[in-house]
Amino acid sequence: MTVQTDKRPAAIRVVIPFVFRHWLQQPGRAAIVAGGLLGATAADLFMPIFSGRLVDALTLGASDAAARHAAFVAFGGIVALGLMSMVLRLTGLQAIVPFTLKTMSDVSRDAFARVQRFSTDWHANSFAGSTVRKVTRGMWALDLLNDTILMALLPSLLVLVGSMVLLGLHWPVLGAVIAVGTVIYVSMTMAFSVNYIAPAARVSNAWDTKVGGTLADALTCNAVVKSFGAEAREDARLAGVIGRWRTRVRRTWYRYNYTSTAQLVVLLCFRGSVIGGAILLWIAGRATPGDVTYVLTSYYIIHAYLRDVGMHINNLQRSVNDMEELVAIHGEPIGIADAPDAKPIDIQGGRIVFDDVTFHYGGHRAPLYDGLSVEIRAGERVGLVGRSGSGKTTFVKLVQRLYDVSGGKILIDGQDIAQATQHSLRSQIAIVQQEPILFHRTLAENIAYGRPGASMAAIEQAARLANAHDFILRLPKGYGTLVGERGVKLSGGERQRVALARAFLADAPVLILDEATSSLDSESEGLIQQAMERLMKGRTSIVIAHRLS
C-alpha cells in the first residue's frame, strides 16, 4: 500500500479562500464575531496605559490630592476597560457558535452532495471509509480553523500592531524593537509551519485516511473474514497500516516540538531586548517607574500573544492540512455532468435505440462497443446473454447514463439521453440487481425509496406483487424492521423480493433485471420469477443472464 505525494498547491492557498467563501455567506454574523472579539482585544490593549498612570500616581504619595485623583481615574479606566472587554468578548463568543456550526454544516453537506454526484468510476476506485474520514475530519478541522483565525490570530495581530504603535509613539526605539522582534518571530513560525511541518502533516493525514479505509474495508466484508477465519490476518494487515501511520505522525509531532523550541529561543531574546531597553530608558531619565510598568505590562501582553501566535499558527496549519482532502473533493471533476441546456426526459413507451455507439472504458485502448446499433421497441422484452465481461452490464449502465458513450448516441423515445437531466432519466428506469443493495433502514423505507412519500397501502401492495408481503409480516416489526447494513439481516431471496417491490412501487416505464435469479434456491427463484413476470408486463424490459435458461 502506497501513498502518492502529488504536487498540489500549498494547502493554505487552497483552504483559506475556500473557508472565506463560506464566511461571506454569513456576513452579519462574521462582522459581529470579528467586531466583538477585536473590540475586547482593543480594550485589553489600553489597559497597560492606565496601569502605568496608576503606578505614577502611587509613587507621588497619598497626601497629594492630584495623585489621589489620578489614581482613581486610572482605577476607573481599568475597571471600565475590563467591563467593556468582558461584554464585547461575550458578544463575539455567542455569535461564533451559530456562525461556526452553520459553516460546518454547509461544508459537510456540500461535500456529501458532490460525492453523491461523482461518477460510477470514482466510487469504484475510492474507499467509502476513506471518503467518510476526509469529510468528517475536514468538518471538525473547520471548527479549529474558525477559532484560530477569529478568536486568536486576528486579536493577536491587533495587539502586536497596536502595542508597537502605542509604544513607538512614546519611545521609537522600543517600537522598532517590538516591530523587528514580532516580524522575526512570526516569519520564522510561518516558515517552519509551511515548509517544515506541513509536508510531514500532509503525509500523516494521507495515512490517517488509509487507516479509515482499511477499517471500513474489513468491517464491510466481515462476513467474508469470518468465513475464512481470517480475523488474525486482518488484524495484522491493520497493524501494518497503523505502524506506517504511527511513523509518519511521530515525525510530524517531533517537528512541532522542534519548532516550539526555536520559538522559545526567539522569545527569550525578544524579552531581553524589550526589558533591557526599558531599564536603559529609566537609567537615562527618559522613563518614570510608571512608564517602565507600562512597558513591562505591554511586553507581557505581547509575550503572551506572541507565544500563543506560535501555537495558533501551528493550529492553523494543522486545521488547514486536515481540511485539505475535503477541499480537494470540490476540485475533482464530477465525471458525468448534465449538459448546460439539459432538460427532463419524458419516457412514455420506452423505445431504446443505440445509434452507432462506440464505447471504451478509460485506460482501455480497444473499444468494448464499436459502431453498435440496436433498437428495443417500446414494451419489448430483450434478453442479454453472454459470458462474463462481454459487456452485458455495461449496456444497461449506458442506458442509465452511468457512463458517457465515446461516439454515437443513445435515444429513448427519440430523445438523446446525453441532453437529458440525469435525475429525470434514472427516475424513469427501475433496476433489480443480482446483489440488491438495501439501506440500513426499515423495510418500508427501502421499498418506498424509488417513490418517496408513498402511502403504506401502496408499499404493501408493491410487496404483495413482489411476493414479499408474507415474509415481511413474519418479522418482529413487520414493515418497520431494520434490515441491517446492505440488508444483511435478510436472506438473498428476501433481499431480492424487497428490490422487486421497490421496482414495482417505482412504476418506471423501463425495467432492467440484472441476473436477478442467478444465485437463489429453487423456491426463492420460483417466487421471484412469478413477481418478475408481473413486473415486466407493459414495460420495456432488459433481462441480463449468463445463459438462455
What are these regions (language model features)?
Residues 30-91, 168-176, 272, 276, ...:
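Transmembrane helix-loop-helix hairpins at lipid-water interfaces of multipass membrane proteins
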Residues 111, 115, 225, 326, ...:
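Helix-loop junctions and hydrophobic alpha-helical segments within the transmembrane domains
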Residues 1-44, 59-78, 92-96, 100, ...:
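Membrane-integrated ABC transporters
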Residues 120, 224, 332-335, 459, ...:
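Hydrophobic patch in the ABC ATPase nucleotide-binding domain
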Residues 62, 166-184, 195, 255-324, ...:
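Helix-loop-helix
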Residues 20, 24-27, 117-124, 137-146, ...:
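An intracellular "coupling" helix at the cytosolic face of ABC transporter transmembrane type-1 domains
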Residues 345-549:
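ABC-type nucleotide-binding domain
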Residues 2-12, 35, 43-56, 81-128, ...:
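Juxtamembrane helix-loop junctions of ABC transporter transmembrane domains
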